[in-house]
């Protein structure tokens, strides 16, 4: 059993105290429960899976220190798997502890947006999705939380607008630019080829496993493009 082997690794190979071993095992068990609930193989979880887990847990954990310790536990588990050849690559390698509330710049110049768009690798399967995300975030002025929960049934491409539910459950109609319509249509073709999970049937933006993108995932996408663009 993987948990028993992990315990032995922590105790015998890492030489950790009994309390530290139990703390790391509790972190593993928390991750394992999340993976089981979302039909994910904990051993072969992806970066997206782990990022979603951290985002989910961060809603319950207020202390950055506590969250940092949990993430350290995740790193430890996947280093163990890598060391013992259960996996070929550590999916937790890029998971970072948020130092402050996740935030995206409210205002970007047209030039900056163009520079971000130029960083999208169009050979990747997620390229159309990521382009559509940028166009809707900055072209239509959506909040990340609004984009996360955007439903297909509230998008009217032919009419050129979408119905957005914002803070306090208030709804508003938001125009969609012709460019955003074009890229979202491309993304829809890609999305239709995915195995969409039942809970994400009406969700506009999903990952390659057909699961709803989280706020953390979208922030990560945008931040990586912004960093690559030197913003």
Q: Which residues does each predicted region cover?
A:
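Conserved catalytic core of the tyrosine transesterase superfamily
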Residues: 1-231
